């Protein structure tokens, strides 16, 4: 195991991961944030350097004090060799399997590795598999070979106009975390609320405020640079409002040089159509999350 330290190593890692997009996207986005201030205080581990086969991004041990907090106890993994990956993840200094944790990756082949480890280390695992989307602008910049112009929507990728008297674009405030938490599919508890508050305080997030000055639609970003937790109050749905929050956030990220990507549940046809209307393109790899609990 090798801990990457210093700006030069992390920049080399980012450059190397770029060659493996979109399979490495979750890890690539996380390393980009580490190279821009590292707001979540993460660390990068590789099996060897510089010719690594497996990379794991994880929090510092001192930040993982709550054994039940899988939002904090999150690992991002990319590997070019599954046998090597299983051996690397098996190391206690790489992953603390005694905790409730989650592993995220845009690499579906890791499922076999994690299921094998679940059998040998006695933990139960729940997998969430979703459609991975990347903005066409990001694809053009990072992986132009993936961009099939024939399949792009005809539109300009901009949302329809909304009534400026009714809705005002704003940033998300920490006081808005509770409403985001209430409607987040992976949230709804105290630990997820703390995670959302941390994301709001650390990254650019956007919302639409209604006439009462409270959020009616929003889009946030997590420590991997992914746009997540987007939602709209039920009484304001079917108006295309969330499209505005996501569009503004995407423009902000593009200006900063970050990849624009997100995931959508395969059953959520509405958000799939919304993603395509913004010229976000489904990727050949999936978005994966494995929630692991020791037995």
From Swiss-Prot:
The protein's enzyme class: transferase
User: Its catalytic activity?
Assistant: an acyl-CoA + glycine = an N-acylglycine + CoA + H(+); benzoyl-CoA + glycine = N-benzoylglycine + CoA + H(+)
* Molecular functions (GO terms): glycine N-acyltransferase activity; glycine N-benzoyltransferase activity
The cellular location(s) given in this protein's UniProt record come to: Mitochondrion
CC per GO annotation = mitochondrion
Entry EC number(s): 2.3.1.13, 2.3.1.71
UniProt cross-references to Pfam families, sorted A to Z: Gly_acyl_tr_C (PF08444), Gly_acyl_tr_N (PF06021)
As stated in the Swiss-Prot or TrEMBL entry, residues carrying the post-translational modification N6-succinyllysine are: 15, 126, 140, 168, 255
Protein name (database record):
Glycine N-acyltransferase
From which source organism is this entry?
Bos taurus (Bovine)
């Amino acid at each position: 195991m090798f801990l990457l330290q210093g700006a030069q190593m992390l920049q080399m890692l980012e450059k190397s991961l770029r060659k493996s997009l979109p399979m490495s996207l979750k890890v690539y986005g996380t390393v980009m944030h580490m190279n821009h201030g590292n707001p979540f205080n993460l660390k990068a581990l590789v099996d060897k350097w510089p010719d690594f086969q497996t990379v794991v991004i994880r929090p510092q041990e001192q930040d993982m004090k709550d054994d039940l907090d899988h939002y904090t106890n999150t690992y991002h993994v990319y590997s070019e060799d599954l046998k090597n990956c299983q051996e690397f993840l098996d190391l206690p200094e790489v992953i603390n399997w005694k905790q409730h944790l989650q592993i995220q990756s845009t690499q579906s082949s890791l499922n076999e590795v994690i299921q094998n480890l679940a059998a040998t280390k006695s933990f139960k695992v729940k997998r969430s598999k979703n459609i991975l989307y990347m903005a066409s602008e990001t694809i053009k910049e990072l992986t132009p070979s993936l961009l099939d112009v024939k399949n792009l929507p005809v539109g300009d990728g901009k949302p329809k106009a909304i009534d400026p008297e009714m809705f005002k674009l704003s940033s998300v405030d920490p006081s808005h975390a509770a409403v985001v938490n209430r409607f987040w599919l992976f949230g709804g508890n105290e630990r997820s609320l703390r995670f959302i508050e941390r994301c709001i305080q650390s990254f650019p997030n956007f919302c639409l405020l209604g006439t009462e000055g409270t959020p009616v639609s929003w889009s946030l970003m997590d420590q991997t640079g992914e746009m997540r937790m987007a939602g709209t109050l039920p009484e304001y749905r079917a108006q295309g409002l969330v499209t505005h929050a996501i569009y503004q956030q995407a423009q902000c990220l593009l200006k900063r040089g970050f990849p624009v990507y997100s995931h959508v549940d395969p059953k959520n046809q509405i958000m799939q159509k919304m993603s395509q209307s913004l010229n976000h393109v489904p990727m050949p790899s999936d978005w994966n999350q494995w929630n692991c609990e020791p037995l």
